[in-house]
């Protein structure tokens, strides 16, 4: 893991290169995704069967998982896993319940009622990865906010495996309250949810993480359906001063590096000795990490330790990165919170590691990546509702403001707009 001592501009330039390397997308992949979407849109279930056999090596006659299979899943998982899942659900629900908003009714002016109605989406699709690892936690994080929002129908898709879907995924789906589950994955699953097939219902919104093909497919169908965000590779930035614990920091960097080779892990510190210790500790921990091959490739390609002269400079650099995950391993992390402008989720102190947020604390782990934390937010209840404004004026209230409306409409050359107001009061002249 390279240690870099640079001025702010040079450091930022190198970080941008790291991020660009992590987000390189080959044109051939984009073309392949578009072709898959076109094929599924036209061929529907037949196309899904073709791609499921091609990419997953499984022949599927029926994509839907039976209620019996879902309910039996709990019999094949550990009790300790179910207990952990229930604890996570409790925390996710208690946190996201506080995000719920109510419709607005404004009756302050005589004869005028204005307001905003908040309504849940009718149905959503949740993509749950099933590639190099299984992610039951993603089920809870994507489904529970939708349930709290009042979404009527939640459809889940996840790639098939030889031998069936991981029962841990099914147990999480059952606990979270998923309505229908289908064994399809990849770009073809996103296309099926966006356009519908004979078996798969069309949804209004698609959420959930996935590989590059899934992310590009979501981008392609945006506008046909809504999506949560375009998720890039996982990333973490650790800001540390001399009080930082090298073992903890290295472990947290590797917790993101093990996701995939394109993940980014960066430490920004004010202390050279700590930087050297973190570098050694990363190598030491890689030796015993089960997913060390993936993590090592990630660290070698997209990992770095930056030395900066001050904590202020470290936070400034972090804000420019706008990371998905930001950890503050500093003396007074809460005092630094006001200086953090751009981050998906912030972890304060040595005992608030990123995996705590991934699994149990309650805030959502579906976060903006690739610098989009500058303008995107974590997944929330808000993502599963839509808002409609309403207006009610009495005759007298409209009459009192008609001249303003007519003036503005005429200035814009929209005379029918003006006429629609004037015609209501012509008989009085």
Swiss-Prot record:
Residues the record lists as binding substrate: 234, 256, 259, 325, 358, 412, 417
Protein name (record): Histidinol dehydrogenase
PANTHER family to which the protein is assigned, alphabetical: HISTIDINE BIOSYNTHESIS TRIFUNCTIONAL PROTEIN, HISTIDINOL DEHYDROGENASE HDH
UniProt-annotated binding residues for Zn(2+): 256, 259, 358, 417
Record-stated family: Belongs to the histidinol dehydrogenase family.
CC annotations in GO: cytoplasm; cytosol
InterPro entries in UniProt: Ald_DH/histidinol_DH, Histidinol_DH_CS, Histidinol_DH_monofunct, Hstdl_DH
Organism: Bacillus cereus (strain ATCC 14579 / DSM 31 / CCUG 7414 / JCM 2152 / NBRC 15305 / NCIMB 9373 / NCTC 2599 / NRRL B-3711)
Any single biological process term in GO: L-histidine biosynthetic process
Pathway: Amino-acid biosynthesis; L-histidine biosynthesis; L-histidine from 5-phospho-alpha-D-ribose 1-diphosphate: step 9/9
Primary gene name: hisD
The protein's role, per its UniProt record: Catalyzes the sequential NAD-dependent oxidations of L-histidinol to L-histidinaldehyde and then to L-histidine.
Record-listed NAD(+) binding positions: 127, 188, 211
Key words of the record: Amino-acid biosynthesis, Histidine biosynthesis, Metal-binding, NAD, Oxidoreductase, Zinc
């Amino acid at each position: 893991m390279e240690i870099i001592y640079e001025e702010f501009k040079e450091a930022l330039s190198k970080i941008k290169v790291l991020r660009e390397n992590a987000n390189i997308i080959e044109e051939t992949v984009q073309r392949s995704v578009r072709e898959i979407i076109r094929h599924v849109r036209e061929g529907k279930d037949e196309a899904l069967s073709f791609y499921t056999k091609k990419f997953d090596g499984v022949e599927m006659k029926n994509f839907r998982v039976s209620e019996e299979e879902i309910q039996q899943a709990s019999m094949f998982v550990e009790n300790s896993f179910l207990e952990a899942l229930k604890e996570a659900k409790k925390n996710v629900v208690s946190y996201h319940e506080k995000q719920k908003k109510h419709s607005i009714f404004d009756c302050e002016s005589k004869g005028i009622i204005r307001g905003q109605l908040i309504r849940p989406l009718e149905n959503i699709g949740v993509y749950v990865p099933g590639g190099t690892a299984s992610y039951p936690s993603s089920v809870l994080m994507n489904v529970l906010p939708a349930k709290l929002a009042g979404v009527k129908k939640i459809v889940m898709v996840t790639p098939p495996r030889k031998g069936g879907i991981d029962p841990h995924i099914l147990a999480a789906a059952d606990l979270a309250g998923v309505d229908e589950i289908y064994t399809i994955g990849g770009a073809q699953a996103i296309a099926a949810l966006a356009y519908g097939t004979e078996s798969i219902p069309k949804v209004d919104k698609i959420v959930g993480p996935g590989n590059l093909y899934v992310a590009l497919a979501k981008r392609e169908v945006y506008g046909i359906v809504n999506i949560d965000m375009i998720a890039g590779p996982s990333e973490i930035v650790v800001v540390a001063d001399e009080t930082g614990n090298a073992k903890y920091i290295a472990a947290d960097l590797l917790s993101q590096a093990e996701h995939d080779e394109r993940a980014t892990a960066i430490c920004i510190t004010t202390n050279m000795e700590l930087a050297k210790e973190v570098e050694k500790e990363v190598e030491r921990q890689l030796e015993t990490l089960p997913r060390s091959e993936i993590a090592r490739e990630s660290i070698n390609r997209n990992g770095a330790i930056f030395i900066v002269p001050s904590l202020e400079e470290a936070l400034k650099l972090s804000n420019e990165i706008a990371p998905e995950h930001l950890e503050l391993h500093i003396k007074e992390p809460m005092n630094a919170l006001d200086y953090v402008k751009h981050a998906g989720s912030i972890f304060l102190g040595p005992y608030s590691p990123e995996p705590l947020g991934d699994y149990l604390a309650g805030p959502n782990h579906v976060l903006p990546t690739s610098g989009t934390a500058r303008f995107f937010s974590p997944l929330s209840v808000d993502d599963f509702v839509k808002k409609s404004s309403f207006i009610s004026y009495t005759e007298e209230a409209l009459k009192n403001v008609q001249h303003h409306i007519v003036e503005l409409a005429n200035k814009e050359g929209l005379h029918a707009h003006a006429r629609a107001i004037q015609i209501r009061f012509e008989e009085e002249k």
